[in-house]
């Protein structure tokens, strides 16, 4: 429970505690003569009504002043706030509380009703009226005569008549003064036990009547109010003869009781007083003191001679229940005797009860108008019954004389609330004359009655009723606008305007219909279309004219009858389906959906393919399209045809839609590296390169499309020192740290390119060789290091720090010069020997070979191959002697564009040809393969299903070959079998083609040296001769391999005679191990130290053949 709800509950509980009684009293104090609109109090705060939250009440809180019709209230109350203000009526305490005992409190009482019913309370408010000094004290007469005996002793005191001041307290009489008084007299003021201030005249000198018998002076009286008020009178003192005894009452205090119905003249009491004097001085005179009220003087008579008090006017206990009569007895002497007579007026049941009706609901012409839907306990009037009698005679009860839906609920002892006790119904009783009876408990009891008229106001409490709450209609479509459908009628039990009915369409009614609000006629104002909407269900309303109006609703169901006026409709004008290229025949291509808005036979649709398209079939009912062909995106990317839909109407209708089937690519192509073009290239990285510099960029392509061709690069091996990092998106290889001396040398990075194909991605890897050095002083040595790098585990780099130093460079130059000189001499010698042995026929064939297709032997060569096979049977056990191998160097003649290049032809023995050409169909089998990945199989176990390349027993083992690293299952390497492959495509723009052969080793390495900044491309030809020709093109080698740029124009041809049975295997850049079933081989670089991959043409991934990355189909033969 939240805090706000808890506060509300607390307020309600507190209100219940505070208002646990139905009535309350509240006292306020006001001063008389207050001006208009003075704030007296705030009932909302003073009664703690502000604790009740407004939202807990059905209606806002109201405060209503309950007063009698014709009364002029002295206060008013703001109904909404409960603030009490004075009105323009004069608040006069002396008038409101006339006749009360002096100094008694004066109260003014009103009642306030607090509404609504949930918190109804009747609050009795008593206003204590404080006196203000608005009256001046007055002497009983303007001339006061007093007689003083001449023998009065000095300081003798004589009472003077007291003044009358209606004000009380400090505003009453406070002091008396003599104005221009004689020195013979003084004035003193004494206070009686009743609090009355009595002036006394003091004799200050001896009097002598004979000398002066009359003294005249002024006496002034003042009150204590602010502003102070006063009055004066003439005091005339007569000096009289001596009287030295005053009268004495027999009883100083007398209390008598007399019924209020005592007749006028009845005796109340007899006073007795005596005087010791004789003669005239013994004659006693009785009179009322000026202190008694005017009402007492009016009601009672005192015989001045006898002292008998009688009733002067009829008594009324209800007006004044007791009277105090102060009687003075004087013999003409100085001080009169005093006696107090208390007259108690006893009650008799002489007053009938009175009924005072104070309306809470203001009447109109004396009649209360009450709505028939007034809630229970609606407060109508406050009934106050009073009886001026006392005790049982004043006990009054109030009730009604017969059964009515009203009751009187007591709130105070003599006040009742008239409220509704049941719900009213104008239709059953329209007017009530309530007779209120009030009876007292006297004997005999007296009663009073009063009539209260209540008129019940008719309310619109009966809603119209439809004769048919549900109405079902039918109308054919394509009707004429304005067609009358039916007439709707309703009845209302009310009368007058409450029974007048208007017909309305509900908010859910469509615009196709109209309803006359007077007659209730329903019409179709628009042409209806069943295909657009078959059924219309809406509501109609019947509303009377009452306030507030009441309404009821009925449901109308309009059914539109069908006509065949619509053709079949395809959900799309053109359908585009996407199917994978590996979707099998008769699989599901897609679903054609067609609808016919008509009904029944008119909506039965048959589907068919137009133009007798046999590639696809469609189910005439379901619209399922199935292929009769296999898809190949590379052959045809899309198919288009038209489908016809025809309905079964009497006059059939049809429509067509275009269908396009798009063949979606499947991730069936692995990434292919373009840069670097092979595993044998390298990039120079100066040691002064700043960290963050891009030193190389790897580029790979993928024949697939979309996400299948989206590539991500990563390093999966090498980079043992962590010098380099690669950007997975761009392939940029960046230097991570500053190079130090220990970092000089060749660094190998194994870079993986992985596509984002789904569900399975494909990948490939390549070697990136980064040579950290100031310059490339010996390219041959670097390529040799690259070659060794291939045979070295990826966890180890081939460092060349010593070779990069100036001293080692000089040593390498000298060694290279010596080796080159020896090689040239050896080549010249071998060439001369070979040429001497060659016949003219072989030379002619050798020249014709240069212009023939190098991959397809002619018939003459095939015959020579057969002859060589026969001869080699005899030479099968010939010893392997280096001296029997010759190299012949020929100068090629300028011929067109070929005069810019040098070639070297290597003639291999027939045994090598038998081991190569005899096992591969060069004329029919494509030999293209990818120069994209290093031969890493000797360092990893492949998870690929391809044949693996394994180290053979003939290969010299090294500890580095014993490190077998595990790759995750998603690393798939493309294997290359032991049979050599030729490629007509390469990333090197200078090479024409390449072949790799299974060999063991060249026992006499031969290398051709050009300038160090040269790169050489080797082209091998295998004509059907006793020797195998290898054509080597040499080109200038820049420090950084630059693709697409030609260099070098010299050309030489060299022929090598390989030892019998020799085999050479050079990696084609594909990953994987050799098939264990293939010929045993080892992996060595060519004698020239140049990797074959350096001489491929530009990579052409789109020219891949079925032989890429797979074992030769003839290798197992």
From Swiss-Prot:
Glycans are attached at residues 27, 48, 344, 553. Pfam families: Cadherin, Cadherin_2, Protocadherin. Residues 27-139, 140-249, 250-355, 362-466, 467-570, 571-673, 677-795 form the Cadherin domain. CDD domains: Cadherin_repeat. Keywords: Calcium, Cell adhesion, Cell membrane, Glycoprotein, Membrane, Repeat, Signal, Transmembrane, Transmembrane helix. It is a single-pass type I membrane protein. One of its GO terms (biological process) is homophilic cell adhesion via plasma membrane adhesion molecules. Its main location: membrane. Residues 1-23 form the signal peptide. Potential calcium-dependent cell-adhesion protein. This is Protocadherin-11 X-linked. It comes from Sus scrofa (Pig). The lineage of its organism: Eukaryota, Metazoa, Chordata, Craniata, Vertebrata.
